[in-house]
Amino acid sequence: MKTFQYAKDLGSLKQALAEAQEIKNDRFKYQHLGKNKTLMMVFFNNSLRTRLSTQKAAMNLGMNVIVLDVNAGAWKLETERGVIMDGDKSEHLLEAIPVMGCYCDLIGVRSFAGLSDRDYDYAETVINQFVKYSGRPVFAMESATVHPLQAFADLITISEHTPDWGNGGRRPKVVLSWAPHCRALPQAVPNSFAEWMNAADVDLVVTHPEGYELDPLFVGNARVEYDQMKALEGADFVYAKNWSCPGVTRPEDYGKILCKDMSWTIDAAHMAVTNNGKFMHCLPVRRGLIVTDDVIESPNSLVIPEAANREISATVVIKRMLESLS
């Protein structure tokens, strides 16, 4: 595996889930794969779970790890072509990327959407330059439009809490619900969550106010429901997440906050109409905006198991990439 951005990059999700369970049972089983190999983690944006879980995964596999915070101690990097670099950016990605490739065997990149130019963001300009110019396998630690390590961890978590699914049992009903936020956030997490849930063939419903339609590339055949309470009826899993306007129906609104309706905050009344549903969120979460304290602290909250599974999803991905080197 030379790149990891989308569910299809893993191939069979059933096999990937089995591999995840194998690794969870013995996290150091494949430590030999990373001997004398180096992972470079490049951060253009902040991180807690991604930084810790990915570094731990690489260490589980016996790798050395270099962490580069682009905005803390490194030269400011220019990402656009054809510009006259007479501002505060001293180095271009086109030189920086192959230099990074000289010092490592794998590269993980975290670079959020700017939310000002939809075409630029959805072209995945930054991470695709790493893929093209680094000469190394590259995986997304959240890019402009996707967060596959999170979505894979979410899928692992859901599969662990639906033991009959896949063995002739009922498909779980999973609801991806928009929730309010004080800042404009990218669509990477909901995009990937919808994509991976479709690939796993769950009964997926996406609910949000009008104007927040996600890109059809990720939503696929999932049902879109603008009535949140109706969408939540009988849900086995409720995945809450804010996202800014994706600009699908009105490109001029891309990246904007169109709604601050607090009735979309997930509370006990929302969870009461579910099928004893489990609450999920990628974290970090704004309590009182996305979800109420009683819901996130309830026994049905899976936010910590999700976070723990980030180590497992990253280990599977890095293992696959190390195997591709041999």
Language-model-detected regions and their locations in the chain:
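Glycine-rich phosphate/diphosphate-binding loop of Rossmann-like nucleotide-binding domains
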Residues: F44-I66, S159-K241, G247
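Phosphate/diphosphate ligand-binding glycine-rich loop within oxidoreductases
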Residues: G34-M40, S47-S159, R286
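Positively charged, low-complexity intrinsically disordered leader regions
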Residues: M1-L52, K56
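C-terminal helix-to-coil terminal segments
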Residues: E297-S326
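Phosphate-coordination loops involved in phosphoryl transfer and adenosine-cofactor binding
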Residues: L33-L39, R170-K173, N276
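Short, structured coil segments at secondary-structure junctions
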Residues: L61, Y133-S134, A200, G220, ...
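Rossmann-like adenosine-cofactor binding region
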Residues: L217-D294, N300-S301
